[in-house]
């Protein structure tokens, strides 16, 4: 289930197997930035796709290049911002919500984990305004997802709310189109 990678370190990063990631990185540091032959994902991108903080932290300590792009022209930051709850997460939240708000705490925990992931990447120097093959920046994705936690982080890191994607929309345009007035206000103040 999920993605199958041709590079073992990418598969290990995707599956949260720190032992295997460590083994490959120890064998040769070039594996830290190896790109999968199918979609160009690096181990860092693979770990960010799934929100695996320990793997991301390990790869950043090994000086993984945070600005490498895959074949969709996306960096690890694009995936960190796009990280959503899995079906299993939603199922647990729904089932546990009535039980002493455990579901709520699970949701808050997952949101904090995502925020931590994005902070780690920003602190490592990821290019905050990198665009993917459709011209989307991480800020575009955060606006689409109405992520009021990540947008201030991205703006603080100098994300440009006026960059337009291939559809001619800026992050501000997206927020206005989706009627996210608080986000639009944040973006207007930043521009």
Swiss-Prot record:
Keyword Nucleotide-binding assigned: no
Gene: Ankrd22
Keyword Repeat carried by entry: yes
Protein name: Ankyrin repeat domain-containing protein 22
Signal peptide: none
Organism (species): Mus musculus
Mapped ANK repeat ranges: 39-68, 72-100, 101-130, 134-163
This protein's UniProt keywords: ANK repeat, Repeat
Source organism phylogeny: Eukaryota, Metazoa, Chordata, Craniata, Vertebrata
InterPro entries: Ankyrin_rpt, Ankyrin_rpt-contain_sf, ANR22
């Amino acid at each position: 289930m999920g993605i199958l990678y041709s590079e073992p370190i990418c598969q290990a990063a995707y599956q949260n197997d720190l032992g295997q990631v460590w083994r490959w990185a120890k064998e040769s540091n070039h594996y830290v930035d190896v790109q999968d032959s199918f979609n160009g994902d690096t181990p860092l991108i693979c770990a960010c796709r799934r929100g695996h903080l320990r793997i991301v932290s390990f790869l950043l300590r090994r000086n993984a290049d945070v600005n490498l792009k895959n074949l969709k022209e996306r960096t690890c930051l694009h995936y960190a911002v796009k990280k959503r709850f899995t079906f299993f997460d939603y199922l647990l939240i729904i089932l546990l919500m009535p039980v002493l708000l455990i579901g709520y705490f699970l949701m808050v925990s997952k949101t904090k984990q995502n925020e931590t992931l994005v902070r780690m990447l920003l602190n490592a120097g990821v290019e905050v305004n990198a665009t993917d093959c459709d011209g989307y920046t991480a800020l575009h994705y955060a606006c689409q997802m109405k992520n009021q936690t990540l947008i201030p982080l991205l703006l603080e890191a100098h994300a440009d709310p006026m960059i337009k994607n291939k559809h001619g929309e800026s992050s501000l345009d997206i927020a206005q189109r989706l009627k996210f007035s608080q986000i639009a206000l944040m973006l207007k103040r930043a521009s």
